[in-house]
Swiss-Prot record:
It comes from Campylobacter lari (strain RM2100 / D67 / ATCC BAA-1060). InterPro entries: A_deaminase_dom, ADE, Ado/ade_deaminase, Metal_Hydrolase. It holds the Pfam family A_deaminase. This is Adenine deaminase. Zn(2+) binds at H14, H16, H194, D274. It comes from the Bacteria. The lineage of its organism: Bacteria, Pseudomonadati, Campylobacterota, Epsilonproteobacteria, Campylobacterales.
Amino acid sequence: MKTFLQNIPKVELHLHIEGSLEPKMMFELAKRNNITLKYKSEDEIKKAYDFSNLQDFLDIYYQGANVLQTKQDFYDLTFAYMKKCKEQNVVHTEIFFDPQTHTARNIPLKDVIEGIWQALQKAKEEFGISSFLIACILRHLSEEEGLKTLDELCLYKDKIKAIGLDSSELNNPPFKFKNLFQKAKEEGFLLVMHAGEEGSSEYIKQALELGVNRIDHGVRCQEDLELVKQLAKSQIPLTICPLSNIKLKVFQNMQEHNILKLLKQNLCVCVNSDDPAYFGGYILENFIALDETFKLSKDEVKKLCINAVNASFLNINEKEKLVKQIKAYK
């Protein structure tokens, strides 16, 4: 089964590029940019990755992002992730980045976007992997700050496909950003939002009301049977991240995870890695972890992979081509 999981064509839709910063690269970039880390070794960093909730993780995540200073840093970070995609047979990926995490440190937005973008283009040429870029607004900050960031992002419509919402979910509901997402839509961006990870199913409903194309996480939809039915009917995708959910105690263990239950209820759920450097695995490791717990059938794996294609922002022809490849895969 591992070989089957390794080689099946995969699409990843929930990946924070800052969350793919491996400890080794964190040290390399800290050295390159003359930054002192509070950790003495890679092992010490890994020990710190014992989180009890989302906030614990975010505190370390934002600290790690400090080593990202130059366009070259963003290029190297992104290209390292794209190499991983090549190894794990990810054929298309839609990557999140957090503009405000970097502009708050006086890093020019242009450097962030161009560094990431150039690495994505290089991966397209070298590995044939297609990709889109999604800019996430930080929900623990104000809508006003988010709107200023959105204005800047409008200069890069040729490079940014969608606007997202991430960071601390509790007490930062989607409606806090109602005006921002309305403006993003008017500007022609697609919309995605993290909702229903630590926040309740109510947050998912708010996100749907704001017209999102996709929900990131969404596992707490199960608290509301009507919502589950609505999601099955509308086929609004949920980009689910199993290892992340265990690491951040959204579920206590993999047996409790509801992704297969939601799949059986005909929701458009797919498998993703979220912040792989912090949560102990990329997309393949997430599939393997699910298989170890639930003994996935090949049909279930194919369905999860096809859902990811259908949930993507690829055009209809590209989707059909990929779905055919997955269906034909043995």
